[in-house]
Amino acid sequence: MDLLTVEHLTKTYGTGENAVHALDDVSFSVPRGQFLAIIGPSGSGKSTLLHILGGVDRPTSGHVYMNGEDVYSRSDTALAIFRRREVGLIYQFYNLIPVLNVVENITLPVLMDGRKVNDARLQELLDTLGLRGR
C-alpha cells in the first residue's frame, strides 16, 4: 500500500475572472519508505500542495489518501488530531512562540495531545540539536 496517494487534486482561489488555479488535476503516489521532493518556481503551487497534503487547507476537488484513508473525509476535530499526530510542517520562516522557552516550544504539541512528555527522548533531542540549557 502507498503511504500517500493524491488523485485529481485541484485548488482554485477566487471565482470567475478572478479565479486562480493553483493546482489543476494533480495525481501521484508515494510508496512507503520513499522520499519525495516538490520543486518549482515561485507561484507554481508547491506551498498550496503541501498545505493540502498536511491537512491545513482543503482542496477544491480531488482526494488525498494517507495510509489508504481519505484525509478530508475526517471531521474538523479528527483533522486537527491528524495534523498534530501525523504531519510535520516546517516553514521557511518558522515562528516559535516567543513567550515559551525551547523545551516548552518542543513539548507543546505533545502536551496539547494529552500525552506525557518522554523526558529521555526530550533530552536526546536537545542534545542532538545542541539546545540543552536554552
Q: Which residues does each predicted region cover?
A:
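A short, flexible loop at the N-terminus of ABC-type nucleotide-binding domains that lies
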Residues: 1-3, 12-25, 76
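ABC ATPase NBD coupling module
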Residues: 17-20, 71-88
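The feature captures the beta-strand-to-loop junction immediately N-terminal to the Walker
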Residues: 39-41
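Helix-to-loop junction immediately C-terminal to a conserved catalytic motif
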Residues: 54
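Conserved ABC transporter NBD signature motif
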Residues: 62-70
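Conserved ABC ATPase "signature" region
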Residues: 69-70, 117-134
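Short coil-to-helix segment of the ABC ATPase nucleotide-binding domain corresponding to the Q-loop/switch region
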Residues: 100-109
